[in-house]
Amino acid sequence: MVHLTTALDPASAVPLYEQLYRSLAAEMRAGTLTAGTRMPGKRRLAAELSVSVNTVDTAYQMLAAEGYLTARERSGFTVQEYLALPQGVQPPAARSAPVAAPPADAAPPVQFDLSTRGVDPGLFPFRTWARLQKELLYSAPELLTPGDARGDAALRQALAGYLAEYRGVQCDPEQLVVGAGLEYLLGLLAPLLPGPAAVETPGYPRARQVLENNGVPCRCLPVDADGLSLTALSASDAAVCYVTPSHQFPTGVTMPAGRRAELLHWAARAPGRRYIIEDDYDSEFRFDTRPLPSLQGMAGADGPVVYLSTCSRSLAPGIRIAYMVLPRQLLGAWQAKYRLYSGTVGRFEQQTLARFITEGYFTRHLARERTAYKARRDALAAALRASFAPEELTLAGLHTGLHLLAQLKDPPLDAALRAAARQYGVRCSLLSDYDLTGTAHSAAGTLVLGYGSLPDADCAAAGERLKKLCTAAREASDTV
C-alpha cells in the first residue's frame, strides 16, 4: 500500500491541484515513490485529502504529461522510472530562496536628470500617434500577419523619401533595413564587415561593445577639433570606420566637409574592402546652422557608407525603431545571411510611423522639438553662466544635439565629481566616461550635461546645484 506524505493547504494562493502535483513530483524525485509503484485511485486519494476528484485528476494528468507517471488502461497510474539529478543540482521546487545581499547605501533620489539619453515625453505627439494606431487597428488586420524581415515596404518607402529630402541620403527602399534599435542592426551588420573597425574616443561605448561582441576587433582612435583623426586612421589596420560626423558623441564636434571628403577617399582606396559606418546621431537637432548633408549622400547609393539612425531621440526611446541604409554591394551578403530571419519591429508600429512621416506629422513634430529643446538649451546655458564665474567654466557643444559640455577650469578629480553628483542628486556623466582607451587625461573635469528630460522650470535650479556639487568636489579633491 502506498503511504503519501502529501499535505495540502486550502488557504494557499497556489491551487490545490498544483500543490498536489508539486508534492507528488518531489516524492518521485526523492525516491519515496519508486518506479513501478501503482498510484492510489483518483476517488480514493481525493477522499483521503478531502479534495475533489478533478483536483487529483488534474495533478495526475500533469505528472503524466511530464513523464513522472504513465497511464495504463484498467490499472490507473504507475510511477515511471526517474533518473536522479546530478549531485548539487536541485529542481526548482527544492531550491532554497536566494540569500539577500546586504543592502547597499541608498543613493539620494535623483532630482536633476542630466543624462544624455533622456528625452522629453511631454513633447511626444500622443494624440496623433494614438489616432493613427487606432485607425490601423480597425482597418488593417493584415498587419497581424508576418511582414518583410527588412521592414514593411510602406515604412521603407517613407524613410527613403524623408532621408533624401532632409539628410541628402541617396538610396532605394530596398537598401533600407528596419530593426528594434541601433545596437540590434549593428550586431547584424558586424559579420558582414571585412576587418577591424576604427571607433572614436571619446566615443560611444555601446557601439564598440556591440562590434566586439560580434567578433569585430576595434581600434580606438582619437578625435580632434574636426572629428576622427584621419592621420590615426590611415596609420591603423582598420578596414571599417564607425563615426558620428553630424554630432560627434560626446564632444559635439561636427565633421567639416573637407574631413568628410578625406574619409571617403580613405575608403575609396580599397573598394569593397573598406567601409564607413555613419551613425547620424542627433542630426535632427541642429539649432543655429544648417546641417551638412550626410556622408552617405556625399558617397551615393553605390558608395562605401552604411547609414544608421534611430527614432529614439526624435520620438522616444521606448519606440524601438531604428533603420540602416546598406550599400548596394552588401545587399547580396545581407540577403544570404538573414533571409530566414523575422522582423523585430511590430507592423502596427511600422505602419504608424510610415503614416506619421508621409502625412507630414514628423517634420512638424521635429520643428516643435527643435524650438523646445533650443529654449531649454539656452536656459540651462544661462543658468550655468549665472552660477559659475567666467574663469571657472567654459561651455562647448551647444549647436547640435541634446547635451552640452561644461569644462571646468582648474578641475577637481573626476572621482570627486562623480561622488558629489551622487550626493547632490544629479544624474550626469563625465567626458572621461567615454574615453574608450582608459588612458586619456585631457578630458578631466568636463561634465556632459543632457537636457532632453530636464524640465524647463528646473534649469535655473540645476545650474545652482551643479555649482554646489563642483564646489564640494573641489574641496574633496584638495584633501586628497
Show the residue positions of the predicted features.
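N-terminal basic, amphipathic alpha-helical segments
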Residues: 1-134, 141-144, 330, 335, ...
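Active-site PLP attachment segment
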Residues: 74, 298-334
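Short glycine-rich anion-binding loops that position phosphate/pyrophosphate groups of nucleotides
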Residues: 119, 246-248, 313
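Conserved core of the PLP fold type I
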Residues: 133, 140-272, 284, 288-302, ...
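Residue-level detector of anion-binding/catalytic polar loops
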Residues: 217, 275, 426-427
